[in-house]
Amino acid sequence: MSIMIPAWVDGTLIPVEKLEAHQRGLRHKAVSVFIIRNGEVLLQQRAMGKYHTPGLWANTCCTHPDWGEDPAACAARRLDEELGLTGIPLEHRHHLEYRAEVGSGLIEHEVVDVYVGYAPENVECAANPQEVMATKWSDASDLRAALSKYPDHFTPWLRIYMTEHADKIFGRDLEFSYSV
């Protein structure tokens, strides 16, 4: 089944097959979510079956909206599909653009709407094994240390978010303002 995502071709936003967008390095829309609980952020380790960046740690969830899908609705949908998380209100925090090679000749050139949500202390994830192989909660200090010591364990976009956009994503919620 072909997944059509919003991408710009010759300056016009049109539906493009997701893999084609990555193969051609087309600028396309994306959504990223960070869920926070008690001063920690929920990270996911991408499933080994993912066609790029398998096994790497990423933010809580990230995806591409379907053609015509509202970004906020997309963020809530993917939280449920990837992690079984529902009912967590999401706040739009930032809009950013980045370009990164993600292996196997694929390129993410994303225009991203970033959302933050706050989970109750008793929240439980039900990770979809086709999407996520592990989850963990990390405080700012631990994530800082891991990003510095093992940058290749993390997706390019998480490294970009945390080194270039943390202030705008987290504000005063977490102490993620730093340089690696």
Locate the predicted segments by residue:
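Acidic, metal-coordinating catalytic segment for phosphate/diphosphate chemistry
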Residues: 1-32
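Local beta-strand/beta-hairpin segments that build beta-sheet-rich folds
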Residues: 14, 93-95
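Nudix hydrolase/Nudix homology domain
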Residues: 19, 96-99, 106-180
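A short, polar/proline- and glycine-enriched secondary-structure boundary/capping micro-motif
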Residues: 25-26, 52-58, 136-139
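A glycine-rich, hydrophobic loop/mini-helix early in the fold
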Residues: 30-64
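A structural signal for short, well-ordered beta-strand segments
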Residues: 33, 61, 92, 113-115
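The catalytic Nudix box helix
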Residues: 43, 60-93
